A protein has these predicted regions:
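N-terminal secretory signal peptides
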Residues: 1-23
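N-terminal twin-arginine translocation
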Residues: 22-27, 37-51
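N-terminal cap/lid segment of alpha/beta-hydrolase-fold proteins
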Residues: 48-79
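Short beta-strand element of the alpha/beta-hydrolase
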Residues: 83-92
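Gly/Ser-rich "nucleophile elbow"/oxyanion-hole loop immediately N-terminal to the catalytic nucleophile
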Residues: 130-172, 297
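Primarily recognizes the serine-hydrolase "nucleophile elbow" in alpha/beta-hydrolase
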Residues: 154-215
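Short beta-strand/loop motif that positions the catalytic acidic residue
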Residues: 219, 225-227
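C-terminal catalytic histidine-bearing segment of alpha/beta-hydrolase fold enzymes
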Residues: 252-298
């Protein structure tokens, strides 16, 4: 993704854009310039962060072989369920941290083998960065879409060997991963996708030659887009352009839907941030589960 798009995304997800919970513009600026993931979490984390236990689950870290590289991945699955359907979980820009792992456990409790590969692993570790600007410039912008899609293919291959039912596979992703969700829904490897506030259009680059808006004619799985009406990084005009394109796209594109939460900012599902909006997050989660069931991923 072009570094300008990444900067816009980072500013949108910071707590400085959530003034009613006490975060100021100064806080946001500090976070962009140097406080990284810790700044995105802020003290609000202790108040709202959801912790899902692993009772009845098998969970932990595994390695996924992909083009000669072992990609670390966090996986959670029901301990007693054979051949569970598979959900690929795609990270935010911060990598597969505690929140993304918790999302996997939530999906596992719903009956899925949920797996989140570290899609930056070849380029470095997101956890090594304390500054969002450096994280964007030195890591995130260096990750090619082609590599990401191939690693997701390899993750499905691993899941199949581990007993997952990849004939009933879906993908969901947040922010950076929301964009990836749209792209992967065009590959034919999944039956459905749920994209949480993923960028829909932007500057093309060598590593990100195309964006979701340009791929609606290639979409092979219907996607549910969950977006915030107050997202400063993804204007509603962009959502409207995507909706118009979907209406004239492939069969899967025409079956895709958007839900916009008028008062929600970017990252409204991220319960460890000040951007968290409980009502929108819970409603979106129920819509995710229903979307998967209604498209045969259950």
């Amino acid at each position: 993704m072009d570094i300008r798009d990444l900067h816009t995304d980072a500013v949108a997800l910071l707590p400085g854009h959530t003034t009613e919970q006490g975060a100021s513009r100064r806080t946001a600026l500090q976070a962009v310039l140097g406080l990284g993931y810790a700044a995105a979490a802020m003290p609000i984390m202790a108040q709202t962060a959801v912790t899902t236990d692993a009772k009845g689950l098998k969970e932990g870290w595994v390695t996924v072989p992909s083009n000669g590289f072992d990609v670390p991945a966090y996986v959670a699955r029901p301990a007693a369920k054979k051949n569970p359907p598979v959900v690929l979980v795609v990270q935010e820009i911060f990598g597969v941290h505690a929140y993304i792992q918790d999302v996997c456990r939530r999906l596992a409790h719903a009956g899925y083998l949920a797996i989140a590969p570290e899609l930056y692993a070849r380029q470095g570790k997101a956890s090594d960065y304390t500054e969002i600007a450096k994280l964007q410039a030195e890591l995130v912008s260096k990750v090619p879409d082609e590599q990401v899609l191939q690693d997701l293919d390899a993750t499905l291959t691993w899941a199949a060997k581990a007993g997952g039912n990849v004939r009933k596979a879906a993908i969901t992703g947040f922010c950076w991963g929301g964009r990836v969700t749209w792209l992967y829904a065009a590959t034919g490897r999944v039956k459905a996708g749920v994209a949480w506030y993923g960028r829909l259009e932007g500057q093309a680059s060598a590593n990100t030659p195309s964006h979701p808006l340009a791929q609606v004619t290639q979409l092979k799985a219907p996607v549910l887009g969950l977006y915030g009406g107050q997202d400063t990084g993804i204007p509603m005009a962009s959502v409207a352009r995507m909706q118009e394109a979907l209406a004239h796209g492939s069969k899967a594109a025409q079956a895709s839907e958007f839900v916009v939460y008028p008062d929600a900012p970017h990252a409204f599902h991220a319960d460890y941030r000040a951007s968290y909006r409980e009502a929108a997050a819970k409603d979106g989660w129920q819509r995710l589960l229903q979307w998967l069931r209604s498209h045969g991923v259950a």
